[in-house]
UniProtKB/Swiss-Prot annotation:
Position of the signal peptide: none
Protein origin, superkingdom: Bacteria
SUPFAM superfamilies: MPN010-like
InterPro entries linked to this entry: DUF16
Family membership: Belongs to the UPF0134 family.
Region called Disordered, residue ranges: 46-132
Feature: compositional bias, Basic and acidic residues: 117-132
Protein name: UPF0134 protein MPN_655
Pro residues composition bias: residue spans: 64-80
Length: 204
């Protein structure tokens, strides 16, 4: 996997593996291959609340076969005319650990792991931790959706009750208008009766 300022470049095989493990949903990871075939992961940054760096997918490239070492020449037979020659010193084997006069950490001493690198175990623990965080967030979202549904039901019920109150108020208003009309008619009748009584009681 290579990285530049614009995007990550990964193969289809790596992309499928990252999709299966949901890695690209949580954080950007750079895979570093060692000479002995082991892989270490470098966590670049979390992208939960940050924009993700785009990923460019390329075709898988077959690994080039390692060159074969030339066979050693056969040793000549031992005899008086051909005394045994001492074996030539073996060439030092290449190791992942740096050595030499400029490096005091040569030999079998294990180099300390830099802080920016993590082992596969630490990587899996980090991935599991993020999955747990996602699960908690999903549970909270589900609870919020339930609350929103209940609020929607309450609002709908209140809306229906308001409609019923409006209908009831309209009916009461019409009833009051009828009562007022009836009272007005009764007042008119009383006025007419009072006028008649005044005429009767007045002297001729």
């Amino acid at each position: 996997m290579s990285n530049n300022n614009k995007y990550f470049t990964i193969t289809k095989k790596q992309y499928k593996k990252m999709r299966r493990n949901k890695i690209e949903l949580l954080f950007n990871v750079k895979v570093l291959k060692k000479k002995n075939g082991r892989q270490k992961f470098k966590i670049l940054h979390e992208v939960e609340n940050k924009p993700k760096i785009p990923i460019k997918i390329i075709e898988d490239q077959p690994e080039s076969p390692k060159p074969l070492k030339p066979p050693k020449p056969p040793k000549p037979p031992k005899g008086p005319d051909n005394p045994e020659e001492p074996d030539s010193p073996e060439e030092p084997k290449e190791t992942d650990q740096p050595g030499g006069p400029d490096n005091p950490n040569a030999g079998n001493k294990k180099m300390p792991t830099p802080e920016e690198y993590v082992t596969r175990k630490e990587f899996n623990e980090f991935k599991d931790s993020n999955n747990q965080r996602l699960t908690k967030i999903e549970n909270k979202v589900d609870k919020l959706e339930v609350k929103v549904d209940k609020l929607a039901e309450i609002v709908q019920t209140q809306g229906e009750e308001i409609k019923e109150l409006k209908v009831e108020q309209k009916a009461q208003s019409e009833t009051l208008q009828l009562i007022l009309k009836t009272l007005q008619k009764m007042n008119d009748r009383l006025d007419r009766m009072e006028t008649r009584l005044d005429k009767i009681d007045s002297p001729k």
